Structure formats: structure tokens, C-alpha cells
Amino acid sequence: LHKEYRRQRQMCIRDSYSPVPEGVMDEGGLVLQKPEDLGEHRAITSAVNEAGGRIVLQILHAGRYAKVSTCVAPSAGKARINVFPPRALTTEEVWATVEGFANTSALAEQAGYVGVEIMGSEGYLINEFTAALTNQRDDEFGGDFDRRIRFPLEIVKAVRARVSPEFMVIYRISSIDLMDGGMTGEEVAEFARRVEAAGADMINTGIGWHESSVPTMAAPVPRAAWIDAIRNVKRAVGIPVMASNRINAPDVAEEIIASGAADLVSMARPLLADPEFARKTRENRADEINTCIACNQACLDRIFTDRVATCLVNPRAGREIEFDDSKTTAPKHFAVVGGGPAGMAFAIN
């Protein structure tokens, strides 16, 4: 299923692989730590490459968001969205985690990925180190701004040293934390400059923490609402910057790039809604795109309740093998009762 989903969407970032067991999202979560784990990864990268696409592996340590009793963080202090209180990492464990990111990156290259994305936003472990709110350490990884950002910079440097020059190192920065005690805009810009100096090839941008009370992706949030925060990062660096969050239409994406606010645009939910989004855009068929309505009901709501993500306007999402593109030899007529998103999506499909 994962292979078919990625094959259809081609250029993509495969998310949420932890470099160490305690960094998983939940019990039984995804970890890439050993060469013997590469078989399933090679199957996916081969499928994407054969379809003409490219795939990057996202390395994510969940930190205090990990729904496991062994969760860890820069400092003790429970997240509002997790029942488990974290244990503060020792200095030695911080360095071991840096090594874990480097090791997973090297394995990702062996598996056929063209790069890795280091997840440093949305309130996960790396983001927790950069914010005074969640970092009350008194060693070399906490205290003032320089020490709070040392952990991610050491990760970028270690990853860059472990992989080939052609292998992409993408850093996903929190362009705006939307949390009291988070980084200021000036700090974000300076941090981005140092991420570039540490060896990152590209910066992706995240918006807000998962526990923030500020909506970032719901339907009432205007399209490209956070572009000023992304532009702040773009102005600070010379490497490509990727925009994200509430960008679900080709004209919006093109306007962002044309304005110079970003060099490229990443989308997640719009590709759940329509895996042909990029092809339809390229072929000037934007009017045929099955647009994400930002309802979050079948994707994020399901993910955060430990269920498989799908899409309210695309019943094939997450069921690519069950509902393939083959045509029946005995077509039938159906009457669809109900004109809401689900009914219309069913009728179209």
C-alpha cells in the first residue's frame, strides 16, 4: 500500500521515521536504525524511481509528543497533547541522538532515497531544543540562543559529513512557533543562516506547534496565510526555501514562487485529495484537480487518533490497492443519494 501510494504521487517526502526507538510517534512506530531494515525502503524507492519520481526520507524524533512511556525531551515538562510526561535527555544521550540522525541518513542513501528531511518544526524534539519554552537545560545544549540551536546544527553537520555530496540534506525549520516562549522572527532568520552554513541544501518551512491554540491548516485559515513567516526565512539564506501550509491550488503556489517568497512549494493534504495534482497542473488542467477542502476529518483527525489516514474527497487515498484504476467488464448503474463531499467524490470515482 505504501509503495503504491508513493508511486502515484512521485516527488514526495516519506515522513516520520525516527532515528532511535524512543523517538517514535507511538508504540510500534517507525524506526530506521539497521541495514537489515532496508528491504521495504528499497521496494518503495524503486517503485517511485521507476515511475520517474524522486523520494526523500523524513527523519523525525517526536520528543515530548511521542505517545510512549519512554518519551524524552530537552527538559522535563509534559505537552498538552500527550498523557506521557517526558524524561530530560542527558548530555550523552543528546550526542547519541545526533549520531542517530547521521546513521539513519546514511541508511536512507543506501536505500535509494535522494535525500533526507530533518524534521525541526511542529514542536517535535529538535524544535523543543530551539525554544526557551521547552529547553531549560544548563549544559552546552541549553540556555542562551546559541546553545539552544546547537543540537539541530550538530545534526545537520553530522548528516552532511555522513552522506555523499549529491545526497540532499533538507532542514524543516519552524518559521513561526505560535507559542509563548518560542523563537522570534529575528531568531528564526539567524537560525536559518546557520543551518545553511552547517551544510543544508534546502530549507522547508513548518508553521506552528501541534499544541498551539492558533489554527494553521483548517478551512477558515486563508490560503498561504503564513507566507510572511516563510519570506522571512527566504530573505535570510541563499539556498532554496520551500513553502508549506494551506497551499492547495496551483495559482496560489505559482504566485508564491513568482513573488520570491519561496523557491518551491510542498503539499501534503492536496496530494491525498488528488495524486494527479502536479500532472494536471503541468498539463494546464487545473480545473480538473480534486481540491483539498482542508476539513482535516479523514487525515489529521484520524492520524491523531491512531487510525490510518484517508481523504474525505478521495476515497482511494490509503486504499490504492483495494481501489485501483482497472475498469470492470460488467459496468453497472448506481444512484448516489447525498450531494455532500463524500457523495460527490463517490459519484466521480
Predicted regions and their residues:
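Cysteine-cluster motifs in flexible loop/terminal segments that predominantly coordinate metals
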Residues: 281-331
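N-terminal Rossmann-like FAD-binding beta1-loop-alpha1 element of flavoenzymes
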Residues: 334-349
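Active-site proximal loops enriched in glycine and acidic residues that flank catalytic Cys/His/Asp
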Residues: 173-175, 207, 245-246, 266-269, ...
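Glycine-rich phosphate-binding active-site loops on the catalytic face of alpha/beta enzymes
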Residues: 261-280
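Alpha/beta enzyme core
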Residues: 10, 18-42, 46-242, 251-255, ...
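Single conserved hydrophobic/aromatic residue that forms the stacking wall/gate
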Residues: 1-13
